[in-house]
Design a protein with these regions (language model features):
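Short beta-strand/loop segment that forms part of the nucleotide-sugar
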Residues: 9, 22-33, 52
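Short hydrophobic helices that act as membrane-entry/anchoring signals
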Residues: 122-137, 199-213, 217
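Membrane-embedded multi-pass helical conduit in multi-pass membrane proteins
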Residues: 216-251
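Catalytic donor/gating beta->alpha subdomain of glycosyltransferases that bind UDP-sugars
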Residues: 101, 155-214
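A conserved acidic beta->alpha catalytic loop
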Residues: 1, 30-39, 87-88
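Residue-level recognition of the N-termini of beta-strands and the immediately preceding loop/turn
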Residues: 22-26, 49, 78-83
Length: 251
């Protein structure tokens, strides 16, 4: 979405203008867009603007992984801010990320979602997703891509195989110390949200799959619990036991 990208870059430029002593470089990962790339003009507060073109659209997770790996191997940097390019990660919150990481330069920052812009039905599904993720992994994952990573943590993440399927899951698995800022999920600059029910399910599975060992252990305890109370739960117990077994086989 080049139209969104152009607006995003302008807003980033506006929100970083007060940080005169910090050099900001912008790397855009193009997920094989079929729309002709327009001429992009580098704003005055951004030191450099570079486009990395993917050969195929393999999804945002692979784009993230590709960009993170490229930056670690090819760029000289202290911090990496990762964000979506459609406006849902609000550029105004870059200030909060920078200010927070300035207070403690040795801990990566994630943008915790405290409010979303979707309708009530989708928000209900999203809360269900977070509960299921917590039950099976024991991890409270309340953030997406929007984050500020210290270089040491980028080094930990860039070679992780799970990064190619889930950024937030990989961050939670490999980084034990994380700080956070409160973040409001913004509206897309152009068009409706691209997060459908199917994509939300894929998103959930991708996160849970990162924690296969924890999922197996927790599933075992849940099955034992259901079997013990099967006399009271009846066919419901059998249904959930079968579901959990199939769930683990899929992972």
């Amino acid at each position: 979405d080049w139209e969104s990208l152009i607006k995003l870059i302008k807003e980033i430029n506006e929100n970083i203008k007060e940080y005169k002593s910090i050099d900001f470089e912008c790397l855009v990962v193009n997920d094989a867009s079929t729309i002709a790339q327009p001429e992009l003009i580098k704003p005055n507060n951004i030191k450099s603007l570079q486009i990395l073109n993917m050969k195929q659209n393999r999804g945002h997770a692979r784009c993230n992984a590709f960009g993170i790996r490229y930056i670690f191997k090819n760029k000289n940097f202290d911090y990496l801010i990762l964000m979506d390019g459609d406006g849902e990660d609000r550029p105004v919150e870059i200030k909060s990320l920078v200010n927070e990481v300035t207070k403690n330069t040795n801990i990566s920052i994630v943008a915790k979602r405290v409010k979303r812009s979707e309708g009530p039905f989708f928000q209900l599904l999203y809360q269900t997703h977070k509960i299921i993720t917590y039950i099976f992994t024991g991890k409270k994952i309340n953030f997406g891509n929007y984050s500020c990573l210290i270089k040491k943590d980028v080094e930990k993440l860039h070679s992780a195989a799970s990064l190619w399927s889930s950024y937030s899951g990989t961050v939670k698995l490999f980084l034990k110390d994380l700080s956070e800022i409160n973040s409001i999920r913004g509206l897309r600059y152009f068009g409706p949200s691209q997060m459908s029910l199917f994509k939300l399910l894929i998103h959930s599975f991708s996160i849970i799959a990162v924690f296969k060992y924890q999922v197996f252990l927790r599933s075992t305890f849940i099955i034992i619990f259901l079997a013990y109370f099967s006399e009271y739960l009846g066919n419901t117990s059998i249904f959930f036991q079968i579901f959990i077994v199939l769930f683990n086989l899929i992972l």
